Curated annotation (Swiss-Prot):
One of its GO terms (molecular function) is calcium ion binding. The lineage of its organism: Eukaryota, Viridiplantae, Streptophyta, Embryophyta, Tracheophyta. Ca(2+) 3 binds at D94, D96, N98, E105. The gene is CAM6. Interacts with KCBP. Ca(2+) 1 binds at D21, D23, D25, C27, E32. This is Calmodulin-6. It comes from Arabidopsis thaliana. Calmodulin mediates the control of a large number of enzymes, ion channels and other proteins by Ca(2+). Among the enzymes to be stimulated by the calmodulin-Ca(2+) complex are a number of protein kinases and phosphatases. Ca(2+) 4 binds at D130, D132, D134, Q136, E141.
Length: 149
């Protein structure tokens, strides 16, 4: 499954993995998974977190290592983001629910994920997605970016 990923995708997932793997030990625990999900405005129960880990925990050790994480991401990409998942993700970023993701909202979510970005980096991310040039990302632009991944 993971062998169908490009080098770019793998290095992107490595970066995502390290956001989850707070203590850098090469494994994601339920505690670490919960921390990241809560920083994204989700509120999973302990049982839900355990289910998520069990779903991809091939060796049954109760944590997710990088190869298991890659398999999960490859699977997720195959049943590409349903309309509902995209709307949900957009809502996470669109804090004031005005239908747009501003630079401030993007910075806020990235900071919650432990990604300290400079103003330039945030502006660059907005510019890359901002098709109509209004300085923020609307839902259509967001979908384009997510589907291009």
């Amino acid at each position: 499954m993971a062998d169908q990923l490009t080098d770019d995708q793998i290095s992107e997932f490595k970066e995502a993995f390290s956001l989850f793997d707070k203590d850098g030990d090469g494994c994601i625990t339920t505690k670490e998974l919960g921390t990241v999900m809560r920083s994204l405005g989700q509120n999973p129960t302990e049982a839900e977190l355990q289910d998520m880990i069990n779903e991809v925990d091939a060796d049954g050790n109760g944590t997710i290592d990088f190869p298991e994480f890659l398999n999960l991401m490859a699977r997720k990409m195959k049943d590409t983001d349903s309309e509902e998942e995209l709307k949900e993700a957009f809502r996470v970023f669109d804090k004031d629910q005005n239908g747009f993701i501003s630079a401030a909202e993007l910075r806020h979510v990235m900071t919650n994920l432990g990604e300290k970005l400079s103003d330039e980096e945030v502006d660059e991310m907005i510019r890359e997605a901002d098709v109509d040039g209004d300085g923020q990302i609307n839902y259509e632009e967001f979908v384009k970016v997510m589907m291009a991944k």
